[in-house]
Amino acid sequence: MTMIKINQSLNQPLEFKTDCLILPCVENKKVAGELKEIDQKLAGAISQAFENKRFGGKSGQTLLLNTNGTMKAPYLLLVGIGKVKEVTPEKICQAAATAAKLAEQSKFKTAATDLSPFDALSKGKSGLYGDLAGAIAEGAGLALYHFDNYKSKDEKDDSPSRLEKLTLLIASKSRQASTEKSIARAEKIISAVHTARDLVSHPGNTVTPTYLADHAKKMARTNKITCKVLGKKEMEKLGMGSLLGVAQGSDEPPALIVLEYYGAAKKKAPTVIVGKGITFDTGGISLKPGAGMDEMKMDMSGSATTLATMQLVSSLKLKTNVIGIVAAAENMPSGSAIKPGDILK
């Protein structure tokens, strides 16, 4: 798991050296605001795009232009964020994802985003600036996820181009603290989501119940989390017949994983998250169709979400109590597999 590096800089967008300058633009019928100055530098290229309806700031719209040496960044990428009254962190997140993907597809190594439009958008709305700044970082980081763990590498082949760094440009020192806080929070969210994606992306012969249990133990050691894993004998004593029944056709032992995070007084009732962890579901005796069965490795997506959520809750140091439970097993057909109609004890 490799995450894009995200930082901030107190700098003027047109004077900042980067491969691509990204400007979030609200929906408009014509060029307005700071775009006027840039449009003049680019000989009216932006105005022409507005007139031809190639770009107008609508959500999801993009316009990539060569700046021809008129500014420090050789390329300018405009990304639409929709009508000014309808701008939300979610829309900013989506716009950032769109821009980041296009920047990477264009083989840019670095990019910078101007946050100055957020000053006006968040005026009179406490905390909104930080939410919008965080949404930029989060959207870019989540969009640029890659899972290359099992891809062979040929020395003759060029490495895939990756956008390695995103700089958030701020116009005032007063925004530094909130922007830094927003970046840090976004990076924790990105890391947790990447954890879930990685677990789901690995094949079934890698992610077994034991693998999930080991992952949980390792995560607990590096976070403020306690971890307890129940094995087959402990589950038998507790009468967990359903989970044991699913697992009895497999050579892989089942595991019941319990993670506990206490960020509030222990007497406060916790939120409990339960994640399904069937690391491969063949259907057992009632075998599923062969076509697409490889996707049954994803029957543990609930467990991946639970583990990632516990990671995030701890890293954010939330002032609440959360318990995560994962029932992990492998469902395989064999002479010892559970049969339809069996009574479980």
Map each language-model feature to its residues:
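Short amphipathic alpha-helical segment within the helicase RecA-like ATPase core
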Residues: T2-G277
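Short flexible/disordered coil segments
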Residues: A120-S122, S191, T195-R197, K232, ...
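A structural-propensity feature for long, helix-poor, extended segments
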Residues: V326-A328, P333-K345
